[in-house]
Amino acid sequence: MGLIDQNQPTIDDYDRSELEPEVDVEQVVLEPEPEPEVAPPPRWWGDFPLEEYQVGRWQVGSMTLSIYRLPREWRIIYSQGNDPLDPTLDIDVPAEVEAIGIDDNVRRYMFSQTQSPVTLTPVLADRPLVVRPAIPFAIETREEITLYVSLPMWLRISVAGVQQPLYEVPSFRPSDTWFGDSTLQGELCYAARAPAQLNISELPKRPYRAIAPILIRNRDEGSLVLDRIKIPVEYLALYNSKETNQFWTQKIILEQNNGRTKLRLGWGSPQEADKTERVSAPRERARRGLDIGAFGGIFRNTRGLD
């Protein structure tokens, strides 16, 4: 018996109109599947109503914050973690009273009568932040770069009926450092474990950290070697993107010329940001064309490029 049964019908025995039409493979275009929409992180700041004997609980990165309202007292309970880029973001308002940590830091504020709501306002640090690149880099004369830096934020806690904020808690508490040529010339700063990238897409995004674009211009005759950069965050406002909940500062422009550094700030949120709203004002107002060469400088080079 042969491999082909002579009694089996062949393709010629069918009505060709009943057959599937031939398809030119080269003409088939597969539409790409749409990427799933990624919802922005929940809004962890703003006004939160709390009734008497209710607790609000926020876990923002590695920091946990609880706010407890009593008839004549507000309690702020918080603890700090060690991971500056912890992705955790969880809001529970109202939460169970049992969620309050017994070993955490506690601050108590007494009033004749407490009022709702409680307000969390993101702000930047109360001191300059010193960023140390993993590897020092040089900017050649007459060149400029834009560096994107991720900055930690503080939570300013306010309550209804009280003019002044009760307290501020950092989402991550940086270590202290001294920035200056000597103990007599310089100032106390925070040592920011802050990611910094030339390409903004490579910068890790966190809803509790702000992105600061820093334009650095070298107008000196020689190379500008950067080992540490002091970011004067006290002059910066905070902006929030309505679409992504990402925080931004205005652009920082640092120009090095004849051994001195001039600071200028952009107006409003930077070009890289989406539609934004201003969330908090600067702690201090910068003078136009502020010369900060007399304030311990901005750039430091202690290791060189070797």
Kindly give the residue locations of the regions a language model identified.
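Interface-prone segments of viral and bacterial extracellular assemblies
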Residues: 2-306
